[in-house]
Design a protein with these regions (language model features):
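Conserved beta-strand-loop-beta-strand hairpin that lines the nucleotide-binding pocket
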Residues: 1, 43-133, 161-169, 223-225, ...
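Bergerat-fold GHKL ATPase/HATPase_c domain
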Residues: 1-37, 141-160
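C-terminal catalytic subdomain
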Residues: 2-5, 204-214, 273-328
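Sensory/regulatory domains in signal-transduction proteins
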Residues: 111, 120-129, 141-147, 229, ...
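N-terminal entry segment of metal-dependent catalytic domains or homologous docking segments
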Residues: 125-179, 183-189, 261-263, 267-269
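Acidic loop->beta-strand submotif enriched in PP2C/PPM serine/threonine phosphatases
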Residues: 151-163, 218, 250-291
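Catalytic core of PPM/PP2C metal-dependent serine/threonine phosphatase domains
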Residues: 179-246, 252, 265-266, 325-327
Length: 328
């Protein structure tokens, strides 16, 4: 769930949407009250300090455990000293200065990326259980948004840990709306059922399985930490990037539409050193971005990386999804 927060009148709506989203996960009233407080303070800060921005709410299941994640993304002046801004009583807007302190107290994890002139991204996580499906040493973050005016997103992503490594899928159903969403969700279901297949057979299975749908652009990236290699197979315009030890490589996809036209299904391999960061996104984001434009961002939490790329490079005329994953 994400919603624009542009003025004080939208703070209560942001809180309502955050609580509504979290309630669907079965959380009790005490947990919902914590989420409401964090959402309120984040939305208020977006208006007071960021000149407006976006509030993003999602579930998470990774190295931190399982719970609800809230992010506030703005293009405001940014902060030169994040540590000072976290303290109760610090304010630059004539307010009591309790917002970040309240967010810190209600959150189990709080991470901020901010630079003067580059805006601010704040991630707060409320942990309500241990990690589930994913291996415990994986950090994951994602942001998705539907085509303007649509109620469903035509993109879908999935991540799973199998015998052959940690594997990420991003699928962008052709067009937008319910039929695009059906194609992307079908891809995610096939992926989850066959995640232990080698990458080329897996993508071939996806291609055949999407034939009854309108098709999709899709990509699969498998991070093999035993061999220190990323295996990548893509059909269509899903962008893939590997970052490791300061080296940035754009991964190669072949043209086509999974389910209809896929003249070549080929795996490309990319060795890495250190802790790799893999980023996949649909064409709802421009590819004209570079992490070097955000000093220090590459080492930050994947949710903040996904959030900032979404904030600054979303085209605004299509469904958009960006996912970042880092084995720890």
């Amino acid at each position: 769930m994400n919603t624009a927060i542009a003025d004080p009148s939208q703070v209560s709506e942001g809180r309502r949407l955050a609580v509504e989203f979290a309630r669907k996960t079965g959380l009790d009233d005490a947990k919902l009250a914590r989420i409401a407080l964090v959402a309120t303070e984040m939305a208020t800060n977006l208006v007071k300090h960021g000149g407006g921005g976006t509030l993003v709410v999602d579930r998470f299941d990774d190295a931190d455990g399982q719970g609800i994640e809230l992010m506030a993304l703005d293009r405001g002046a940014g902060m030169a000293d994040v540590g000072s801004c976290l303290a109760d009583g610090y304010s630059t807007a004539g307010s009591p200065g309790t917002g970040f302190g309240a967010i810190t107290r209600q959150s189990d994890r709080l991470v901020i990326f901010s630079r003067p002139g580059l805006g601010t991204a704040v991630m707060a996580r409320l942990i309500f259980g241990p990690a589930g499906k994913l291996p415990p040493r994986t950090a994951l973050g994602a942001v998705s948004a539907s085509y303007p005016g649509e109620t469903v997103c035509g993109d879908h992503w999935a991540f799973a840990a199998g015998r052959t490594g940690r594997t990420l899928l991003v699928a962008d159903g052709s067009g937008h709306g319910p039929e695009a969403a059906r194609a992307a969700l079908t891809a995610a279901q096939i992926f989850s059922d066959h995640v232990d297949d080698e990458c080329v057979p897996l993508v071939d299975r996806l291609h055949r399985g999407l034939a009854p749908t309108r098709g999709a652009a899709l990509a699969v990236a498998r991070i093999d930490t035993t061999e220190s290699i990323v295996r990548f197979v893509g059909i269509g315009n899903i962008a893939g990037t590997l970052v490791s030890d300061g080296d940035v490589r754009r991964m190669v996809s072949h043209n086509g539409i999974a389910g209809h036209v896929a003249p070549r299904i080929r795996e490309f391999t990319y060795p890495f050193t250190g802790e790799p960061l893999v980023i996949l996104h649909s064409d709802g984001l421009s590819t004209k971005w570079g992490l070097a434009d955000y000093p220090g961002l590459a080492a930050s939490h994947p949710s903040l990386i996904a959030g900032i790329l979404f904030r600054d490079h979303r085209r605004g005329r299509d469904d958009a999804t960006v996912v970042a994953v880092r084995p720890l």
